[in-house]
């Protein structure tokens, strides 16, 4: 059973849904990229089939180099077999048309999940299986017993909290050394950039 209050500004609703296997600043692979990205593709491809919707897309991320050193580091990494699945340093005409940068650019093989398509489709699927409840979730209503957990008449063996930034306020998790962070929204409009 998924319990969700439909919070309009939850991270899932406003996130871009992007994945990027490379840390830009240090030009290193993201943690467990070699394991997690194949699992991401496999899982979302299966969900596309289940929901009969298209919502996972591969998309290259353009990295403009701030210096010759950054360009050299990128080209060296792109030639390294450990990074070859993620980095591309071949010229691309559609990028060349808009990227007027003296040190050049490289591309990172990333992508995104179209969350405005995925989230409502998955929500409807869960509703069709009687596995979704739109409701506030109050931790004080949780009761633990020998067979698992009970909440407002629903019983389960386990409970998974997916509270996002509200985890800090949780009576169960407030001891964790978490700090609030925030993302930024950036809307880009550029003539000739046909992505």
Predicted regions and their residues:
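Short, glycine/charged-enriched secondary-structure capping and boundary segments
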Residues: 15-18, 34, 77-79, 173-177
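N-terminal Rossmann-like FAD-binding beta1-loop-alpha1 element of flavoenzymes
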Residues: 1
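Flavin-dependent oxidoreductases
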Residues: 144-195
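Flavin (FAD/FMN) cofactor-binding and adjacent substrate-gating region
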Residues: 46-133, 141, 145
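Short, well-ordered alpha-helix to beta-strand connector turns
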Residues: 15, 129, 156-157
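Residues that flank catalytic or metal-binding motifs in active/ligand-binding sites
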Residues: 15, 58-60, 181-184
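Conserved FAD-binding subdomain of flavin-dependent enzymes
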Residues: 5-57, 72
